[in-house]
């Protein structure tokens, strides 16, 4: 570990294999807390490369508890968070819309870190039990069309690194790795990021990891989603090739709205917003969910364009299918807990 730490501290990039070696030492507890902290900060100051992120993500994926399912394709809508915008849980709400449109979702997520409410927090407030076994999560994906992959329960090797991350309190490579390490091996992904300079590199990383089609996005108003209030930078990766462009709501027939209209609050408030959107309430909250669900449907190759995706997402809500997915997930997790009681 000392040799790898010295190399990074000197501003020299690691190869993918070296990044894998460093990550393995950290995930197995062989690296000391001081070495982990120094490595993470040296890497942050130098700037993480595509090869370094790819190598680290490979190790984290390999060491995760795998979620097995029988769906031919699953999509994830997990983002980095950390944008400080305090929006409601847009990608989590969009996940129900995507599932309502017939595309299976393996939603990877966690509790809030820098925001008020993480995906795990809002799902609990919606009455969904999260303490499922890996086998039960796979069944939920198969039977309901959506499953929640609670990161701390599935990335148990993180126990060696988590205390150091908390003590540092600064962004580091692990802020990027969560959305890159879906334990159900999602082949399609919508990934929001907190920095526009990350869209293209992380799209390339997803291609390196075997994801077939992904959209990595950053709203220029600062949100780690496709924005309803400003242009969004989109790096679309399909079969390893990356194309970067900009999207505005008007491109898909939607109107812009101030970012204040999509602000969230406590987990209870955000749960109410999710339920209202899934129940068909019109307005900017619905529109931003339509936009992001459309991107996930495009990544899953369910539609050919974002505009088609918006139309299909609207059908998912207006037909009641998106709401029924939420209700089925709630009932499924309650039934499992009752059976195990």
From Swiss-Prot:
Pfam name, any one: Glycos_trans_3N
Gene3D superfamilies in alphabetical order: Nucleoside phosphorylase/phosphoribosyltransferase catalytic domain, Transferase, Pyrimidine Nucleoside Phosphorylase, Chain C
Catalyzed reactions per annotation: N-(5-phospho-beta-D-ribosyl)anthranilate + diphosphate = 5-phospho-alpha-D-ribose 1-diphosphate + anthranilate
Residues annotated for anthranilate 1 binding in this entry: 79, 110
EC class name: transferase
Binding residues annotated for 5-phospho-alpha-D-ribose 1-diphosphate, in chain numbering: 79, 82-83, 87, 89-92, 107-115, 119
The name this protein goes by in its record: Anthranilate phosphoribosyltransferase
Source species: Symbiobacterium thermophilum (strain DSM 24528 / JCM 14929 / IAM 14863 / T)
Gene: trpD
